[in-house]
């Protein structure tokens, strides 16, 4: 400061020198400020109008603001707050780390007002940068530079987000380093696979996957992990800890990434669109899995047969068929039917089995194994059991040999011999306890059970009609929208359902794969075959509720019911006179030809 004033005087500017303070006081205001900083705020700058130094303001004392100035008398140092301070300023002084006491002492002295056109040697601190550095939050006591801290906006913990992925960072430098990974410009690259990393430590951790190192074992089971964070995350499966709750519905999750994916269900956000169709997805993995429908890719292939799958869980479910067959070959004395419900049970993990059956008390390590086991209890009260599995039926096989069973999957109740099906009996692990029909997937069984219960959980928003499955609802909604997405490649005719297109294509190919077992007549669709078989069996399942007359086809019943209705049959489009009878009940229906 002294050198600056001397330089100004040499340039021709008139700047007064600081007056000498009395003997009891420090020699000048600058030394006084320096002693104040060295004593950590025990005394403040003493000044008054009587002996004011140039550039200093009045009313700055070592005592309280209301104490009178004692002039040249020595005053006892007291710990007092500076004038104009508010509660919390002392907290701010404690928060800021003092690196240069001399520089802070000089900042106490203001630049002379008549030299305001010159740059000040005491730069004003950037309050916004100071707020970012020390993360001042709303409600912080005190003020800084005349600005109330309670008015400052909160600063996000990680304000910088990556546009390529969903990760966020605290500063721009870390964000730029991360973005180099998307461009393949990481400073540390793995010599084995070429993957880039921002830090060498991350690359060394990654190399454990190539060497197969898993130094972190689980104390509850036999699993091992390459990172401690993965072990910590895995231990939550044993402890049941879910530390990440959803603020909207209260549902808790064991991983933060699962919480982020779940929160998109509340916001409706689907940031990943498909380039082939209009579908959007919440996760990138779901988009990749969906795109296999367009590309036809099936990356998961069975090692025991030639079948391949689009999803890994489909491959795991398919491999149960081979596992059941291998158990049968290894233990010929104890046959295990692959279509038995117990054949689909997943081996329980080592350790406790928390899922117990309420009927027999048997415990299981997986909840799905308990659900499969409980289906056995649903067969109670069915007196006619099966000799090969634990399923039962209400129908006596001796009295009705045509009753369909899981071990005769090629027949259907009341439908005669059916065509060969794509799913073999060895792949049917889920069976209906009501009719015994087998399914390859559990969700197919759940959808089939709605036929027996009459449940129709899917309602049309336009007409209110309800359906037992979502695909049926989607197909029905095309009747309102008029959409016909399935076009015939031969004639261009379009259909609302894929099954209707397949039935129509038989017209061009002349294919009639469904043959009648009685008269050997062939049909292009199974529905036509079932309708034809009513001639041989004499079945008339559609009866009129008013006259008890029965019909083999529903269309014949609808046409018959017009007789009982108020509206007469539509008149023929000709110039012939109307019939002689006038009573609608005397109308004779046209003959029916089979």
From Swiss-Prot:
Residues in cross-link Glycyl lysine isopeptide (Lys-Gly) (interchain with G-Cter in SUMO2): 97, 368
Residue ranges of the region described as Interaction with STAT3: 1-183
GO biological process, one term: regulation of DNA-templated transcription
A GO cellular component entry from the record: nucleus
Keyword hit for Transcription regulation: yes
Ranges of Polar residues composition bias in the record: 31-47
Induction: Down-regulated by CTF1, PTH and OSM.
ZnF start-end (C2H2-type): 160-182, 188-210, 216-238, 244-266, 272-294, 300-322, 355-377, 430-452, 458-480, 486-508, 514-536, 542-564
Biased composition, class Basic and acidic residues, residue ranges: 54-64
Signal peptide positions on this chain: none
InterPro entries reported for this sequence: C2H2-ZF_domain, Znf_C2H2_sf, Znf_C2H2_type
Statement: the UniProt record of this protein carries the keyword Zinc: yes
Molecular function terms, GO-annotated: DNA binding; zinc ion binding
Location of this chain's protein in the cell: Nucleus
Region (Disordered): 1-86, 313-351
Keywords: DNA-binding, Isopeptide bond, Metal-binding, Nucleus, Repeat, Transcription, Transcription regulation, Ubl conjugation, Zinc, Zinc-finger
Family from the record: Belongs to the krueppel C2H2-type zinc-finger protein family.
Function description: Transcription factor that promotes adipocyte differentiation and suppresses osteoblast differentiation in the bone marrow. Enhances the osteoclast-supporting ability of stromal cells. Binds with STAT3 the consensus sequence 5'-CTTCTGGGAAGA-3' of the acute phase response element (APRE). Transactivates several promoters including FOS, OSM and PPARG. Recruits a histone deacetylase complex.
Oligomer and partners: Interacts with STAT3. Enhances STAT3 activity by keeping it in the nucleus.
Name of the protein in its database record: Zinc finger protein 467
Species in which this protein is naturally found: Mus musculus (Mouse)
């Amino acid at each position: 400061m002294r050198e600056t004033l001397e330089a100004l005087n040499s340039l021709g500017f008139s700047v007064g020198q600081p007056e000498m303070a009395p003997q009891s006081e420090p020699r000048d205001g600058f030394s006084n400020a320096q002693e104040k900083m060295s004593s950590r705020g025990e005394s403040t700058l003493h000044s008054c109008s009587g002996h004011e130094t140039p550039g200093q303001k009045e009313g700055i004392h070592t005592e309280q603001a209301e104490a009178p100035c004692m002039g040249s008398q020595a005053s006892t140092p007291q710990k007092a707050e500076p004038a104009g301070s508010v509660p919390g300023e002392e907290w701010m002084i404690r928060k800021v780390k003092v690196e240069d006491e001399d520089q802070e002492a000089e900042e106490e002295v203001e630049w002379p007002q008549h030299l305001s056109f010159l740059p000040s040697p005491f730069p004003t601190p950037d309050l916004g940068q100071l707020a970012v550095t020390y993360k001042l939050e709303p409600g912080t006591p005190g003020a800084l530079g005349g600005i109330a801290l309670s008015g400052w906006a909160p600063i996000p913990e990680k304000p910088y987000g990556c546009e390529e992925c969903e990760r966020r960072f605290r500063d721009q430098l870390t964000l730029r380093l991360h973005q180099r990974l998307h461009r393949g410009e990481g400073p540390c690259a793995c010599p084995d696979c070429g993957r880039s990393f921002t830090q060498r430590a991350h690359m060394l951790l990654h190399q454990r996957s190539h060497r197969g190192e898993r130094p972190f074992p689980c104390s509850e089971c036999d699993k091992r992990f390459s990172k401690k964070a993965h072990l910590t995350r895995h231990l939550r499966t044993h402890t049941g800890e879910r530390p990440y709750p959803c603020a909207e519905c209260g549902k808790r999750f064991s991983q933060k990434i699962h919480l982020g994916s779940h929160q998109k269900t509340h916001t409706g956000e689907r940031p990943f669109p498909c380039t082939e169709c209009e579908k959007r997805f919440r996760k990138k993995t779901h988009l990749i899995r969906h795109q296999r429908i367009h590309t036809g890719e099936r990356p998961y292939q069975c090692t025991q047969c030639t079948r391949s799958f689009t999803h890994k869980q489909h491959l795991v479910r398919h491999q149960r068929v081979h596992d059941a067959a291998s158990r049968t070959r290894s233990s010929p004395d104890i046959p295990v039917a692959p279509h038995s419900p117990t054949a689909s049970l997943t081996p329980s993990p080592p350790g406790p089995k928390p899922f117990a059956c309420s009927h027999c008390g048997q415990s299981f390590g997986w909840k799905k194994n308990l659900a499969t086991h409980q289906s056995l209890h649903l067969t109670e009260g069915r007196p006619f059991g099966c000799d090969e599995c634990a399923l039962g039926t209400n129908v006596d096989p001796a009295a009705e040999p045509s009753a369909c069973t899981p071990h005769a999957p090629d027949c259907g109740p009341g439908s005669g011999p059916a065509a060969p099906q794509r799913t073999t009996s060895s792949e049917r692990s889920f069976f209906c306890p009501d009719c015994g029909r087998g399914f390859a997937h559990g969700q197919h069984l759940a959808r089939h059970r709605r036929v027996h219960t009459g449940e129709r959980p899917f309602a049309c928003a336009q007409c209110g009609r309800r359906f037992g499955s979502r695909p049926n609802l989607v197909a029905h909604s095309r009747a309102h929208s008029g959409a016909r997405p399935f076009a015939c490649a031969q004639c261009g005719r379009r259909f609302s359902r894929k099954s209707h297109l397949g039935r129509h294509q038989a017209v061009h190919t002349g294919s009639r794969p469904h043959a009648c077992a009685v008269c050997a007549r062939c049909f292009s669709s199974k529905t036509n075959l079932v309708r034809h078989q009513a001639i041989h069996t004499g079945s008339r399942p559609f009866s009129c509720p008013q006259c008890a007359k029965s019909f083999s086809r529903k269309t014949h019943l609808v046409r018959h019911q017009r007789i009982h209705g108020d509206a007469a049959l539509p008149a023929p489009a000709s110039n012939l006179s109307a019939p002689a009878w006038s009573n609608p009940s005397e109308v004779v229906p046209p003959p029916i030809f089979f």
